[in-house]
Design a protein with these regions (language model features):
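Active-site proximal loops enriched in glycine and acidic residues that flank catalytic Cys/His/Asp
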Residues: 96-99, 136
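Sec-exported extracytoplasmic/periplasmic mature domains
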Residues: 81-91, 95, 106, 142-153
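Short, exposed beta-strand "edge-strand" segments with a Pro/Gly-rich flavor and a Y/T-containing core
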Residues: 62, 89-95, 125-132
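Acidic, Ser/Thr/Gly/Pro-rich low-complexity segments that form flexible
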Residues: 1-89, 100-120
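Histidine-centered active-site loop/cap adjacent to the catalytic His
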Residues: 118-167
Length: 168
């Protein structure tokens, strides 16, 4: 890439960030930045065999840049705040699933089994990296049950998460 006009070569010996398309820079490509995300929908064969990310930049539609991530986070916060306000206004139980999913990042133990966001082996998220596994949905259901029980002073029993299928 040293011969590509406008490309700032920041490569070092060892691991480097992927090379991604970026129409906003002169060269039209750059190294990915810390905090940017490569989508799991990227064709794996293109990474392995077509040189995407190393000798060819990863197409923009497979990359979430820092601005896009900030926009997503802002929209998520706006939607969640609206939902919470409506629940409060109508005296309904409100489950903050965004906060709950953030607790999974730290790991949740249920009856001796730890669930985390670790891809494939964490047990909470499916192989698409977005949706929960049946066990992950059972964890979410338990969070809903806890909230309903607290708000309405009910006694709905918790689900045994470990009885549901996981990935492994």
């Amino acid at each position: 890439y040293a011969t590509v006009p406008g490309f700032n070569n920041n490569f070092v010996a060892g691991a480097n960030y992927f090379v991604v398309q970026d129409p906003s820079v002169t060269a039209g490509l750059r190294q990915a930045k810390l905090g940017e995300l490569i989508l799991l929908t990227i064709p794996q064969d293109s990474l392995k065999y077509a040189g995407w990310g190393s000798i060819k930049p990863i197409p923009k539609n497979y990359v979430l840049d820092l601005n896009e991530i900030a926009n997503i986070q802002s929209a998520t916060m706006t939607f969640n705040n609206y939902i919470e306000q409506q629940a409060i206004a109508h005296n309904l139980a409100y489950v903050d699933m965004n906060s709950f999913l953030k607790t999974i990042q730290k790991g949740i133990v249920f009856n001796g089994v730890t669930y985390s966001p670790t891809f494939v082996t964490g047990g909470a998220f499916s192989l698409d990296g977005v949706h929960l596994t049946p066990r992950g949905y059972a964890l979410a259901a338990n969070e809903m049950i806890r909230t309903i029980n607290a708000h309405y002073k009910s006694t709905i029993p918790m689900i045994d998460v470990n009885k549901y299928n996981g990935i492994l």
